[in-house]
């Protein structure tokens, strides 16, 4: 078991290690509050929307960014998605992701977003978000959608959207390393809106604070990893034994999704952001099902019976007029 897995288990179980780390967690929270109080970011030349979270690990943020990009495009914006580019090795910074880039060059999540979004949105990478946004603006895009960045205080965004998901959206309520939070729970008040799944909405009482909008992640179909033109219906999973391969932060959710679709999964977990190679999956029993985030890293050596579970995020309808009203000051 890795150190991260050990810590995550401790956070969930309230183990002795997590308890012993609480003084460090309290220090993390104090530093985060100090940064929010004293770091004054500057606005970009075009409106910017940050989509982020309070904790480490998956929260459904990437499919939400894709859904918001579609929604904003329909509303008439030219949307550029901006990412820090964690783990990416592009030839230069900032860098505009190309659909045929390798995962090593572009990073798995930015490449996934670039391939899903087609030609109407672009994806830009740079640790300095201001430089990435400036590059997007120079290319004619008039709205930047930041995949993560709630804690990136050098930027003063137009809107901050905070994603909360799962029955324990705030974990054990403690900051790193005593818990999964990057900031204290009251940092939610710095958001302009909360995007919550049903489980998170039930777990966090509704009080005075930012408006809430529900979302859900819906499986759509199965797509062949080595040929996106081939697909299968979800009904084909009923009663089928499959090998579930994943290298994401919360793999149990993926397994639960497959079980909910009637499959009988045999899980094979890899670390989050794992760089897959052919030998990782070559001898696993088929059929094999993986997440879209993992599939972009396996396309070159995937076999005919390797499949991606394609998902989409759906936001409640009331989020659209709220977004349009919030962005009115930037309409030209």
Curated annotation (Swiss-Prot):
GO cellular component, one term: plasma membrane
Reactions catalysed, as given in the entry: a lipid A disaccharide + ATP = a lipid IVA + ADP + H(+)
Pfam families assigned to the protein according to its UniProt record, in alphabetical order: LpxK (PF02606)
GO biological process: lipid A biosynthetic process; lipopolysaccharide core region biosynthetic process
Residues that coordinate or bind ATP: 55-62
EC class: transferase
Pathway: Glycolipid biosynthesis; lipid IV(A) biosynthesis; lipid IV(A) from (3R)-3-hydroxytetradecanoyl-[acyl-carrier-protein] and UDP-N-acetyl-alpha-D-glucosamine: step 6/6
Matches recorded under InterPro entries: LpxK (IPR003758), P-loop_NTPase (IPR027417)
E.C. code: 2.7.1.130
Keywords carried by this UniProt record: ATP-binding, Kinase, Lipid A biosynthesis, Lipid biosynthesis, Lipid metabolism, Nucleotide-binding, Transferase
An example Gene Ontology molecular-function term: tetraacyldisaccharide 4'-kinase activity
Top-level division of the source organism's lineage: Bacteria
Protein purpose: Transfers the gamma-phosphate of ATP to the 4'-position of a tetraacyldisaccharide 1-phosphate intermediate (termed DS-1-P) to form tetraacyldisaccharide 1,4'-bis-phosphate (lipid IVA).
Family: Belongs to the LpxK family.
Name the record gives this protein: Tetraacyldisaccharide 4'-kinase
């Amino acid at each position: 078991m890795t150190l991260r897995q050990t810590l995550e288990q401790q956070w969930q179980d309230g183990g002795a290690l997590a308890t012993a780390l609480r003084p460090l967690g309290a220090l993390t929270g104090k530093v985060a509050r100090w940064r929010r109080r004293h770091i004054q970011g500057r606005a970009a030349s075009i409106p910017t929307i940050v989509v982020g979270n309070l904790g480490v690990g998956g929260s459904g943020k990437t499919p939400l960014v894709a859904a918001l990009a579609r929604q904003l495009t329909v509303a008439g914006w030219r949307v550029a998605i901006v990412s820090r580019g964690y783990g990416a090795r592009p030839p230069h910074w900032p860098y505009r992701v190309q659909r045929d880039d390798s995962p090593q060059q572009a990073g798995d999540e930015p490449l996934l977003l670039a391939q899903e979004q087609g030609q109407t949105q672009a994806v830009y990478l740079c640790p300095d978000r201001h430089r990435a946004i400036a590059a997007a603006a120079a290319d004619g895009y008039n709205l930047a959608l930041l995949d993560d960045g709630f804690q990136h205080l050098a930027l003063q965004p137009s809107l901050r959207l905070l994603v909360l998901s799962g029955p324990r959206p705030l974990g054990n309520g403690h900051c790193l390393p005593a818990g999964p939070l990057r900031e204290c729970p009251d940092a939610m008040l710095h958001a302009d809106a909360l995007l919550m799944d049903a489980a998170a909405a039930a777990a966090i009482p509704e009080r005075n604070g930012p408006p809430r909008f529900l979302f859900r992640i819906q499986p759509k179909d199965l797509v062949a990893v080595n040929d996106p033109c081939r697909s299968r219906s979800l009904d084909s999973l009923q009663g089928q034994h499959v090998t579930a391969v994943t290298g994401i932060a919360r793999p149990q959710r993926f397994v639960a999704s497959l079980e909910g679709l009637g499959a009988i999964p045999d899980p094979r977990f890899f670390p989050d952001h794992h760089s897959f190679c052919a030998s990782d999956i070559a001898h696993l029993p088929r059929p094999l099902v993986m997440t879209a985030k993992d599939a972009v890293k396996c396309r070159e050596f995937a076999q005919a019976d390797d499949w991606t579970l394609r998902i989409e995020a759906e936001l409640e309808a009331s989020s659209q007029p709220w977004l349009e009203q919030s962005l009115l000051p930037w309409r030209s």
